[in-house]
């Protein structure tokens, strides 16, 4: 397979990750503006978070996407899924009441989930043996670019921001010269979502031209030639009746679930950390977050040069050591800008060597093509579904004013230790092997 071709396909597919992460950050950063504009209560905000791209919406979408990608092909997802995404974003853009906003968040979240298993699976299946890890890293860089760019746009377009005058001009052109107050301010969030709509349209035009995965086609044709059932129930029946597949699901879900539970609640800790550091304005806090995401992108880019040459376990351990060091810094006290920078840099290193990279890589390597996307969709459903529940439980541990901060921090360390230990014990040796070789080693000729 042509090296440049695989890179081009990876970049086209990686735009999905930009849109996924961008939707999460755009939704979270604009909630206060929507709350004031629509007069939403904390219950309303809780529902928006619960069904969003960060929780239940993505969980449901992952199950749907995994099934569709295995049954109808990876190209099927890339032909239609971003149309669903654009409909969801357009609903948010045009929202004038809570039901519209809720529907937009849900549809966008489902689309985000649908794209995940197909994305990681397609990248691995279309990559050369010695470029599979590199291409997954390039894909993951988009998860860093998304939040970084959306945060910057949010800062520039926010009320009082450098480009808010441009937002005012646009808002008055659409809503009339009398538009003011919260109705005017919420246009800054609409503009951020507009940027996602534009990128989604570009990505859709690129992705719908992608070729189908050769491995999926070969597996499908072989199954038909043997007269095998290619239906959904049969695929999941095979998955759960195979001990190797079940053990793999448990292993991957364990390492990713424990790490993701920590990553998903970082938003609760950051305000507390900024307050502890003292004298940090909201703008400075956002800039620190942008720097953190820039570190994630830089570290992941560096990893892409070595992940196919050195043991995966080495980078997996280094990433979790950085994560544990981050929380030790937090527990010992973030005093002043020095501590704040240590926190941002360490968490950025963890993000650049994140468990998600290895989950995406191993998840696409350790299952046969006939239920590869479905298995990833199932695991993503489990992880994001538990994250939604954990987000509710965590608020009680943390407390309204952060009184449970220390206990919550120790919970984070315990979860990271579990991810580290399970990963070290179960990390597979797949480097330098084709997907066909890995499948034959693990599942035989069946």
Locations of regions flagged by a protein language model:
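Extracytoplasmic gate region of multi-pass secondary transporters
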Residues: 28, 243-300, 391
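Cytosolic juxtamembrane N-terminal segment immediately preceding the first transmembrane helix
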Residues: 1-25, 36
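Extracellular/periplasmic helix-loop-helix junction of adjacent transmembrane segments
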Residues: 28-60
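Cytoplasmic helix-loop-helix junction between adjacent transmembrane helices
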Residues: 104-141
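Helix-breaking motifs and short loop linkers at transmembrane-helix boundaries and internal kinks
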Residues: 73, 94-99, 333-335
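Glycine-rich segments within core transmembrane alpha-helices of 12-TM secondary carriers
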Residues: 133-163, 167, 199, 380-391
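Helix-to-loop junctions at the C-terminal end of transmembrane segments
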Residues: 62-73, 299-311
């Amino acid at each position: 397979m042509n090296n440049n071709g695989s890179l081009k396909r990876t970049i086209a597919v990686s735009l999905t990750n930009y849109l996924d992460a961008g939707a999460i950050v755009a939704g979270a950063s604009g909630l206060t503006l929507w709350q004031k504009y629509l007069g939403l209560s904390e219950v309303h905000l809780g529902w928006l978070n619960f069904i969003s791209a960060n929780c239940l919406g993505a969980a449901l979408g992952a199950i749907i996407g995994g099934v569709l990608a295995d049954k109808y092909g990876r190209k099927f997802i890339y032909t239609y899924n971003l149309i669903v995404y654009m409909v969801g974003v357009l609903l948010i853009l045009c929202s004038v009441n809570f039901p519209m906003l809720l529907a937009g968040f849900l549809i966008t979240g489902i689309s985000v989930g649908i794209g995940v298993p197909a994305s990681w699976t397609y990248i691995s299946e279309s990559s050369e043996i010695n470029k599979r890890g590199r291409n997954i890293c390039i894909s993951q860089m988009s998860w860093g670019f998304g939040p970084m760019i959306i945060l910057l746009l949010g800062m520039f377009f926010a009320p009082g921001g450098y480009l808010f005058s441009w937002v005012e001009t646009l808002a008055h052109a659409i809503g009339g010269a009398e538009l003011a107050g919260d109705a005017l301010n919420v246009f800054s969030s609409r503009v951020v979502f507009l940027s996602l709509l534009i990128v989604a349209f570009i990505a859709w035009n690129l992705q719908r031209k992608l070729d189908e995965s050769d491995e999926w086609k070969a597996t499908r044709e072989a199954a038909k030639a043997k007269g095998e059932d290619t239906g959904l129930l049969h695929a999941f029946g095979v998955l759960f009746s195979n001990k190797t597949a079940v053990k793999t699901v448990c292993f991957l879900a364990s390492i990713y679930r424990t790490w993701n539970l920590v990553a998903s609640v970082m938003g609760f800790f950051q305000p507390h950390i900024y307050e502890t550091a003292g004298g940090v304005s909201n703008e400075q806090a956002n800039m620190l977050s942008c720097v953190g995401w820039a570190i994630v992108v830089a570290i992941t880019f560096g990893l892409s040069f070595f992940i196919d040459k050195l043991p995966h376990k080495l980078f997996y351990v280094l990433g979790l050591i950085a994560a544990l060091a981050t929380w030790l810094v937090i527990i010992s006290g973030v005093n002043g800008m020095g501590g704040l920078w240590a926190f941002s840099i360490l968490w950025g290193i963890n993000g650049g060597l994140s468990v998600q990279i290895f989950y995406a890589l191993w998840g696409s390597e350790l299952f046969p093509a006939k239920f590869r996307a479905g298995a990833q969709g199932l695991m993503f459903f489990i992880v994001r579904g538990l994250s939604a529940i954990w987000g509710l439980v965590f608020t009680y541990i943390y407390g309204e004013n952060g009184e449970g901060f220390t206990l919550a921090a120790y919970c984070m360390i315990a979860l990271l230790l579990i991810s580290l230990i399970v990963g070290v014990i179960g990390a597979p040796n797949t480097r330098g092997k084709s997907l066909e070789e890995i499948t034959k080693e693990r599942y035989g000729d069946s």
